[in-house]
Each structure stands twice: as C-alpha cells, then as structure tokens.
Amino acid sequence: MKISASLKSNYNHHDIVVMTDETAKEMQISPQPIGFRSSVSGAELLLLSLATGFCNDFYREAAKRNMAISGLEVVFTGEFGEEGEQGTDFTYWAHLLSDEPSSEIEDLIQYTDRIAQIHNTLRKGVSIALTS
C-alpha cells in the first residue's frame, strides 16, 4: 500500500488530500481565522492518527474473530514542548461497548496494540527524508 497526504495552504484556505494506492479522499480542516496556519496542530493530528489507526485495526481484528462490537472510544494523550523537541509520554486508553466476554475483549485490545501499524511505526522509529 502506498499512502500519501498533501496539504496546499493559502491565506484562509487549505486543500487536503489523502491517498491510498490510487484512491484519493479530500478532507476538510479549517485554517485559523486569520492567516495561513491550520486550526489543528500537527501534534493533534498525530494523536488522531494513532487513535484512528487503533480503531480501524481493532474493528478489522474483531471481525476476524466474529466479535460483535457496538462502539469504541480511543483517547490518546502526549506531551509536546518547545519547537524542535520530540513528543513524549504518549499514552492511550480504549473503551468499547460489547456483550462479548471481558477476557476476550481484553485479549483483542492487547493484540491490536501489538499489531497496530501506526503504533509500531512510531515505536520502532522511522526515518524522514526531505526531498526536492
């Protein structure tokens, strides 16, 4: 899977497109009321990416196990300091609605945590290269 995300920022306007292989989807994120910056920070989007990735992976794995899940809430937190500093203290919790046995739910949560792609990308580290 080839994944990409693009952002074109102009005064009071953002064009955002995310793409998986050849499937593109437009997204809306408002700019700040005055200026070029986004109303949502990159740190907030990173944590949303982790929550979304866990959620999608969780539902996929629940379906493989034929588990009925009626809802899931995932909350990620992290600390970010001054410009240039990396984030720290990333933690999360997941709460779900299901009539499945609690031991099976806990097993699925732990399994999903181990195999979640976005989590593992950050846990194992990734190089980022600026190209021209």
Model-derived regions: residue spans:
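Extended beta-strand/beta-hairpin segments
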Residues: M1-L48, N56-S132
